[in-house]
Amino acid sequence: SYGTRVAQQYAMRHPQATHSIVLDSVVPNAQGLGNIFARNLDDALALQFGVCSKDPACKGKLGDPRAELDRLLATLRSTPPTVHYRDATSGEWKQGVLRADTVAGLVRMYAYMPLASGLLPKLIQEANGGHYAGLMALAQMMSGEMQDAMAMGMQLSVVCSEDARSMVAREEDAGTVLGNLMPKGMAAMCAV
């Protein structure tokens, strides 16, 4: 994370004031973060979804979660459905279009919450059966929470100054859940 980078820089510049630091998700300072999201997410999903795939009861009920996700994303890319869903925050009925990018973003954020990510295989299976309301409600709820929780201006100030040049579309990311969504989106924001 960029917070980790700040901690590393502080420790490097002020060793006399740093007794110890605890870092989570350490990435070398020289590595651009813009192009590691897609591969890292797919690696995390392989571990998370692998738990279900190795459990006969889970696999029997939900199939192969990664294959189910890939099937859902393909469907949403070709024909994104209009979904009637109940807003998880207000309880109001709403309508919206469920897009592959929305689901990819949802899956990305849930990779940070392993306990909550246990919901995804079931919701993905339901969506593949044409029942999109649960997934749409969760995606909209997550989107609203993230707008309040993430300081995009702060993140972009660091991303754009440190990693903008490294954010390029890469062929090897095309088959991942995120594809080139993150580097393209961040590069566009940094260009403004």
Language-model regions: role of each:
Residues 71-192:
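Alpha/beta-hydrolase fold active-site neighborhood
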Residues 2, 25-27, 164:
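Short, flexible loop/turn elements at secondary-structure junctions
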Residues 1-11:
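Glycine-rich nucleophile elbow surrounding the catalytic serine of serine-hydrolase chemistry
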Residues 9-72, 112, 122-133, 137-146:
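A catalytic-pocket lid/entrance helix-loop region that shapes and gates access to the active site
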